Amino acid sequence: MTGGGKSGGKASGSKNAQSRSSKAGLAFPVGRVHRLLRKGNYAQRVGAGAPVYLAAVLEYLAAEILELAGNAARDNKKTRIIPRHLQLAIRNDEELNKLLGHVTIAQGGVLPNIHQNLLPKKTGKTAGGKNASQEM
């Protein structure tokens, strides 16, 4: 044996263990996504790049929703995001509303909306029309 000693091939190779999430520069867990893809019976085999890509997409969507919800919370002078802020963020964004159109958010409420027919009619005041009738 040229290697000598008790150290096998794995000990020297795993000196600096690095997760797949950190390799990809992601915060979402690539390993967990890979495990869920395998256990979910979506396909017989799962490629190595699929969980990385899916974790990146999920992280982007979460960041986008939290960004908009944070803006909604700040507009309401709050420092904590509540389900109402998530609802406002998703429903006011055209693409997110299309993606999550059939999703119900608990304690989210509804968007404030008054139909145009129910609003009071705006009367166009003209300077010559009203003054002429009152000058008699």
Swiss-Prot record:
Entries under InterPro entries matching the protein: Histone-fold, Histone_H2A, Histone_H2A/H2B/H3, Histone_H2A_C, Histone_H2A_CS
GO terms, biological process: DNA repair
Keywords assigned by UniProt, alphabetized: Acetylation, Chromosome, DNA damage, DNA repair, DNA-binding, Methylation, Nucleosome core, Nucleus, Phosphoprotein
Positions of short motif [ST]-Q motif: 133-134
Acetylation recorded as keyword: yes
Composition skew (Gly residues), residue ranges: 1-11
Post-translation changes: Phosphorylated to form H2AS128ph (gamma-H2A) in response to DNA double-strand breaks (DSBs) generated by exogenous genotoxic agents and by stalled replication forks. Phosphorylation is dependent on the DNA damage checkpoint kinases MEC1/ATR and TEL1/ATM, spreads on either side of a detected DSB site and may mark the surrounding chromatin for recruitment of proteins required for DNA damage signaling and repair. Gamma-H2A is removed from the DNA prior to the strand invasion-primer extension step of the repair process and subsequently dephosphorylated.
Disulphide linkage map: none
Annotated site residue numbers, Not ubiquitinated: K121
Primary location: nucleus
GO terms for cellular component: nucleosome; nucleus
Modified residues (Phosphoserine): S133
Subcellular location, record wording: Nucleus; Chromosome
N6-acetyllysine PTM positions: K6, K10
SMART domains from the UniProt entry: H2A
GO MF annotation, one: protein heterodimerization activity
Pfam families, alphabetized: Histone, Histone_H2A_C
Family, similarity comment: Belongs to the histone H2A family.
Binding partners and assembly: The nucleosome is a histone octamer containing two molecules each of H2A, H2B, H3 and H4 assembled in one H3-H4 heterotetramer and two H2A-H2B heterodimers. The octamer wraps approximately 147 bp of DNA.
Function of the protein: Core component of nucleosome which plays a central role in DNA double strand break (DSB) repair. Nucleosomes wrap and compact DNA into chromatin, limiting DNA accessibility to the cellular machineries which require DNA as a template. Histones thereby play a central role in transcription regulation, DNA repair, DNA replication and chromosomal stability. DNA accessibility is regulated via a complex set of post-translational modifications of histones, also called histone code, and nucleosome remodeling.
UniProt domain comment: The [ST]-Q motif constitutes a recognition sequence for kinases from the PI3/PI4-kinase family.
Name the record gives this protein: Histone H2A
Organism: Pyricularia oryzae (strain 70-15 / ATCC MYA-4617 / FGSC 8958) (Rice blast fungus)
